Structure formats: structure tokens, C-alpha cells
């Protein structure tokens, strides 16, 4: 049977771009593949950029990411959900992969080029990031990897590393296949300036207080053609229209689109209708998240169980890897 693996950055509370772009897909895949689907909060990846993480908050953000995923419906009793640093085999396999991967292949990664340009002295962890990512995936012999399109190059390198290892030490790893969520939309930031991103500060968090969400929507830009209330607009050129596609039922969507094009409704009324449906959609998630935070032992026990399940697979694979590489076994 196929096995799914996906890494989740410990960014704390995810935003609606994460939710519609990836998290809902995790739930669907979890229902399809059960315990053959593994989801890992990749806290080791988080520290590859020393200036981009806070050691005082990393543990809490890791915990919060587990809460958020459980709250949207990812059931830890039906999938394997764990924390990367709790399974030391990730680091061990990553080191072995760095020994078979030419530096040039790591240096040509587009993300490395983009991120390294920010540093006067580039941390080596940033360069080795793809080798660790390859270890994350291949350690579980996963063949399905749901990722964003920005990770395509890393998946191709993972496949190349698998081929190199198999050539050098014997057939061991399958070459994983990247799976993209074709239904995922490119969700614009609430400021209208490109894609929603925490680094840009233009997000709507799925666990954000509704009052804060409304304040963001209230001042969010709309179709610039609607200078006056009586001016018709084009909802396809308005980020509020984009958000309605995510949250509103068909009848509301029809009302909004017709009302915008005929100036039958104003932008404020359109935003209020959107806020109603955002609240309806996110309130059960926020309620469940509050319950989980009130019962941290449940979350920690679920993570411990996931750690054990992941290690059971990882230790078996690493025994095979060590034997093929030639390490002494006592």
C-alpha cells in the first residue's frame, strides 16, 4: 500500500492560505490512507535559519501546530502525527545523505539561492536543508508527498538522492512522487499585495479572534473601480470576492456577484456577509482548538503515540540502511 508523508513547519497558528492550500488535503489523505499517512512537525527545519526562529517560542509553536491540525479534523488516532526532533533517525539518515550528495546539487536549489542572499555568512544548515527533507521522506519509504509547487525542486533532489543511495549501496528506497492539491487556490493576502504570507503580515489566522479578523476585512482593499457606492464593480478583481469563493455557499456567492456587478450592494455589506460565513466556518475549529488547549495532556499523549509509531518504522529502515552502508552492529 502507498505511504504518505508531509512535513509541517511549526509556525504557530496557521492562516487560511495554509488551511485551504494544505491542511484540508491532509485530512482527506488521512481518511484515505489511515496509518499509512505520516504528518511531521518539522522543528529541525525551523532552526536552519538562525534569524528566523525564536528558541523561546519554538516549543509552543510546535505544540500549537499540532493543536491546529487536530482542530481541523486530522485525527491522531487514525494517522501518524509526530514531531521531527523526537525521532533521531531523521538526523542520522540526513548525515548519510549529505555524504552521497554533491555540494553543487545543494547549491543549485532555488530556495537556497534566495535565502542565502540574505546572509553575509550563510549557515550550513540552510545548504543541507534538502538533504534533511530527503531523509524525512525516505526514512518512511513514502511514495506520496503532498507539497506546494515551490517544493518541486526539493522533491526532484530527493528522488536523485534515492537513486544515488540505491546505486551505491543496493536497492533500498522508492522514488517518491510529489502530489499537488489541484483544487488549492492562490489565496491573496488581506492587504491585496500578492500571496497571503506570515512574513508579509497580511494573513487571516484560522484561530484568530473574530474581532481582529473583522478589523482586517473592514479596511481591506476592494475593486478600485468602485469609487462610489453606486459604481458597479467586478468581484473577480476583488480579494473579498476571492474570499467569498472559499467561505460562502452558492446562494450567497450569487447574491454577492450580482450585487457587486450591478452596485446593488456596497462593499461594506459584502464584507459583513463574508464575515458571517467566515465565523460559521471557523467557529467549530476555534471551539475545538480551545478544548484541546484546555487539555494539553491529550495533545502531548497523542504526540508521544505518534513519535512511537514513527520510530517503529524509522528504526527498521535505519537498521537496513546501517547494514548496507557497512556500520558495525554489536
UniProtKB/Swiss-Prot annotation:
GO terms classed as biological process: tryptophanyl-tRNA aminoacylation
Superkingdom classification of source: Bacteria
EC number: 6.1.1.2
InterPro entries per the UniProt record, alphabetical: aa-tRNA-synth_I_CS, aa-tRNA-synth_Ic, Rossmann-like_a/b/a_fold, Trp-tRNA-ligase, Trp-tRNA-ligase_bac-type, Trp-tRNA_synthetase
Subcellular location: Cytoplasm
Intervals of motif 'KMSKS' region: 195-199
GO molecular function, one term: tryptophan-tRNA ligase activity
Pfam families, per the entry: tRNA-synt_1b
Primary location: cytoplasm
HAMAP family xrefs: Trp_tRNA_synth_B
Name assigned to this protein: Tryptophan--tRNA ligase
Chemical reaction(s) catalysed: tRNA(Trp) + L-tryptophan + ATP = L-tryptophyl-tRNA(Trp) + AMP + diphosphate + H(+)
Keywords, in A-Z order: Aminoacyl-tRNA synthetase, ATP-binding, Cytoplasm, Ligase, Nucleotide-binding, Protein biosynthesis
Motif ('HIGH' region): 10-18
Species this protein is from: Deinococcus radiodurans (strain ATCC 13939 / DSM 20539 / JCM 16871 / CCUG 27074 / LMG 4051 / NBRC 15346 / NCIMB 9279 / VKM B-1422 / R1)
Residues noted as binding ATP in the record, renumbered to the chain: 9-11, 17-18, 148-150, 187, 195-199
Taxonomic lineage: Bacteria, Thermotogati, Deinococcota, Deinococci, Deinococcales
GO cellular component: cytosol
Role played: Catalyzes the attachment of tryptophan to tRNA(Trp).
Subunit composition and interactions: Homodimer.
